[in-house]
Design a protein with these regions (language model features):
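Surface-exposed charged/polar residues within alpha-helices that form helix-capping/stabilizing sites
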Residues: 18, 88-91
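Generic alpha-helical structural signal
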Residues: 7, 84-87, 159, 175
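Hydrophobic structural segments characteristic of membrane proteins
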Residues: 40, 99-178
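A hydrophobic, helix-centered structural microdomain
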Residues: 1-66, 103, 170, 175-178
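Short, glycine-rich, amphipathic interfacial segments at transmembrane boundaries or analogous
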Residues: 43-82, 140-160
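Cytosolic-biased juxtamembrane loops and peripheral soluble domains of multi-pass membrane proteins
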Residues: 3, 67-85, 89, 115-122
Length: 178
């Protein structure tokens, strides 16, 4: 019951409340991004959602517009050269993730779940298939993120995502959230 209906209802409530309560901050950050560097306020990127369905993830733009597009930041040669001043602040505080509240509201994502893989991260997607981790909505944060984020090897990240999927519960989501 929790996994299907209650979790989705909580996602809708939390994301709607988040958008409403933080609208002033979202607007302030959007203006700051525009003043800091040329280009759009938002960064959109093709990601993989539930059942390997593609969707466009929404984030505040933290990098220059000439940055290679479909590559994780940690794989770029000298990624610091691409990050804007405002981007450094947004990444350090994780405020660049706030626009994903929209992705949660419309059902592309959940508040808690495996982080959505890039469409071209075939190795991660294949590894997650072993554990059923592609069969749930991806999350803003998740079990693997609180255990190491990008520092984890793909096999370990997929295993942690699979453990989460196997043990989804309100209590586990609360533990991941806080």
């Amino acid at each position: 019951m929790y996994r299907n209906r209650i979790k989705r209802l909580l996602d809708i409530l939390l994301s709607a409340c988040g958008i409403l309560c933080l609208s002033w901050l979202l607007l302030l950050l959007a203006v700051a991004i525009k003043l800091d560097s040329p280009g759009p306020v938002f960064f959109r990127q093709k990601r993989v959602g539930i059942g390997k369905r593609h969707f466009q993830i929404l984030k505040f733009r933290t990098m220059r517009i000439d940055t290679p597009h479909d590559m994780p930041t940690h794989l770029l040669h000298d990624p610091e050269q691409y990050i804007t001043r405002m981007g450094r602040f947004l990444r350090k505080t994780s405020l660049d993730e706030l626009p994903q509240l929209w992705n949660i509201l419309v059902g592309d994502m959940a508040v808690i779940g495996p982080r959505p893989a890039l469409w071209n991260q075939y190795d991660l997607l294949a590894e997650r298939d072993k554990y059923g981790a592609n069969d749930v909505r991806p999350g803003l944060t998740g079990w693997a993120q609180i255990h190491g984020r990008d520092e984890l090897e793909i096999a370990e990240k997929a295993k942690l995502d699979g453990w989460y999927v196997e043990h989804i519960s309100f209590g586990l989501d609360v533990k991941c959230f806080f």
